[in-house]
Amino acid sequence: MNNTIFNVLNKIKNTNISLNKADVYHILEHIINKDYQWIISNLDHKLTKKQIYKIDQILDLLKQNYPLAYILKSKYFYSNIFFVNKDVLIPRNESELIIDHVSEFVKNNNDLLIVDLCTGSGCLGISCALLNDQNKVILTDISYKSLKVANKNIKKFNLINTSCLNGNFIDVLIKNNLKANLIICNPPYIDINDQNIDKNVIDFEPSIALFAPNKGLYFYEILIKNIDKIVDTNKNFLIVLEFGWLQKDSIEQLLINNCLKYKWEFKKDYNDYWRNLIIKNF
């Protein structure tokens, strides 16, 4: 086989593995240490036998349903590459919508305290820090292993005003007397009894980042009940949460039952599913 980039791309695409275009190019970027633009401009470039061998190893693991992000130990999120491993949830494309919803608020303010609860890899909070490095960003998680990954990403992007804090959900803010101006969070939201979950998610991703009690509503209920304890209500504040596509009605009922006094709205994702809750006072 002529091992040009062009032929290798076709080889990967023709394997019986479900990969999107971005995944295919991410594999090549990882193996030859070149970016997308270089790759598509050098399709006649020949790969070495060692590089071909590494690609074959990756394809073998993918055939066993091993997640690509864990194989490469990296995942694109909001146009940046983040380090990930099996200790953190793999960042999803739909989670980028959280950054879309907060970007204007982050860019237009230089003295915010931004808190990323249940941070995992840190991709949400770090993406905010990269939008405006004048704000202070705190990444929190109950898992020390997750924070080790998040801290590695902080160092990767040379962020001075971003730090990690270990603790349980909002308790870590209350304990440290922290009141945020912006809270972003993609908490565990899968019902413990939910049987309709992809097998590779169950088999490989950390359960602590997936499942929550009370039909997956546990973290939303706690946050909604305690907003005044964790945000600075004397200034403009913004909270953006991600939730499961079938949870909108249940979360809306939580808001109503708790007589939330702040503005709130729901937003859909790329596939027209309800995905985000936005709470704010402006």
UniProtKB/Swiss-Prot annotation:
GO biological process: methylation
Presence of keyword Lipoprotein: no
Binding site for substrate: 186-189
Residue sites binding S-adenosyl-L-methionine per the record: 141, 169, 186
One Pfam entry name: PrmC_N
Keywords: Methyltransferase, S-adenosyl-L-methionine, Transferase
Domain of life: Bacteria
InterPro entries per record: DNA_methylase_N6_adenine_CS, HemK-like, N5-glutamine_MTase, PrmC_N, RF_methyltr_PrmC, SAM-dependent_MTases_sf, Small_mtfrase_dom
EC annotation from Swiss-Prot or TrEMBL: 2.1.1.297
First-level EC class: transferase
Reactions catalysed according to its record: L-glutaminyl-[peptide chain release factor] + S-adenosyl-L-methionine = N(5)-methyl-L-glutaminyl-[peptide chain release factor] + S-adenosyl-L-homocysteine + H(+)
GO molecular function: nucleic acid binding; protein-(glutamine-N5) methyltransferase activity; protein-glutamine N-methyltransferase activity
Family stated for the protein in its record: Belongs to the protein N5-glutamine methyltransferase family. PrmC subfamily.
The protein's role, per its UniProt record: Methylates the class 1 translation termination release factors RF1/PrfA and RF2/PrfB on the glutamine residue of the universally conserved GGQ motif.
This protein's name: Release factor glutamine methyltransferase
Taxonomic path: Bacteria, Bacillati, Mycoplasmatota, Mollicutes, Mycoplasmataceae
Gene responsible for this protein: prmC
